[in-house]
């Protein structure tokens, strides 16, 4: 089963509605006393200005701690951020670990914003972004030491193709790091499913998909309580304020934003709503000599061509 043009259009419309513009981000920074032309990456992601993952920047810290238990990326590592959005998670990774990050997203306006924000924060040399489909990536096999995918898989119908591509671009022994919601999705998700495509396998189904693609499951850490607490806090602020604020969700019109938040709160508070961190390792099919990691580049490109 493949993702349809209708799925893509619905997703684009959804994220266009909740994504802040560069001007809106600059205004929020100035209101906080930060010069948007000379800002640090953390001054963006700590205010949730460039993150769309569930739980925002607090969840990024949790993810980094879990990865630190296994194999934290280092300065020589290249990490792929699937569904990078505005690039906040990637800049967080550069800030935290000193690695390099390549981000892909199917929505051009988000890639443009990600590039602009990396330029503003001086991270243009450690981050790069391109428009690409997660199920049809143009990177060589084994190009990345880690693939991060935060609350993105739930929007992709073609799960088998998705995880096959992730396994293909991971080097042997490389890590898949993902955060997502598992199914079956309860009726409380109906308002969200009207807005955007949602396809959530159960946790056993998700593990089978990951392992069937050639990866070995390492751990699953439930995060439902953390995410629910975050959304409850945002809902309170949305009620008390006018609806405008620093996070992407609060840029939605007040009524629409409240309805979407309520759907998530009801879902995560039910027996059917679960979110969690999954780590898996690419099965080592053969040994790889030290220092032989490939730089990510388009298939067919020669070394030294760049990109």
Model-derived features with residue positions:
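A short SAM/SAH-binding and catalytic strip from SAM-dependent methyltransferases
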Residues: 146-158
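Short, glycine-/aromatic-enriched active-site segment of Class I SAM-dependent methyltransferases
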Residues: 178-198
């Amino acid at each position: 089963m493949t993702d349809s043009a209708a799925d893509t259009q619905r997703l684009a419309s959804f994220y266009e509605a909740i994504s802040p513009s560069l001007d809106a981000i600059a205004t929020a920074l100035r209101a906080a006393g930060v010069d948007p032309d000379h800002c640090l990456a953390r001054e963006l992601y700590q205010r949730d200005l460039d993150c769309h993952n569930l739980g925002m920047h607090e969840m990024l810290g949790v993810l980094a701690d879990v990865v630190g238990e296994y194999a934290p990326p280092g300065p020589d590592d290249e990490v792929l951020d699937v569904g990078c959005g505005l690039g906040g998670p990637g800049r967080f990774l550069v800030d935290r670990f000193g690695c390099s990050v390549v981000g892909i997203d199917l929505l051009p306006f988000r890639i443009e914003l990600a590039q602009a924000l990396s330029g503003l924060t001086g991270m243009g040399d450690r981050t790069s972004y391109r428009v690409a489909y997660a199920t049809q990536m143009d990177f060589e096999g084994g190009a990345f030491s880690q693939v991060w995918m935060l609350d993105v898989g739930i929007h992709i119908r073609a799960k088998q193709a998705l995880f096959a591509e992730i396994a293909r671009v991971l080097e042997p022994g490389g890590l898949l790091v993902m955060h997502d919601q598992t199914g079956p999705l309860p009726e409380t998700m109906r308002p969200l499913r009207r807005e955007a495509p949602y396809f959530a396998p159960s946790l056993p189904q998700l593990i089978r998909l990951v392992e069937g693609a050639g990866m070995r499951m390492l751990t699953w850490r439930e995060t439902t309580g953390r995410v629910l607490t975050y959304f409850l806090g945002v809902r309170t602020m949305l009620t008390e304020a006018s609806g405008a604020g620093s996070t992407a969700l609060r840029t939605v019109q007040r009524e629409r934003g409240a309805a979407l938040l309520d759907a998530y709160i009801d879902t995560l508070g039910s027996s059917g709503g679960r979110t969690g961190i999954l780590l898996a390792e690419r099965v080592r099919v053969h040994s790889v000599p030290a220092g032989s990691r490939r730089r990510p580049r388009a298939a067919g490109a020669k070394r030294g061509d760049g990109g």
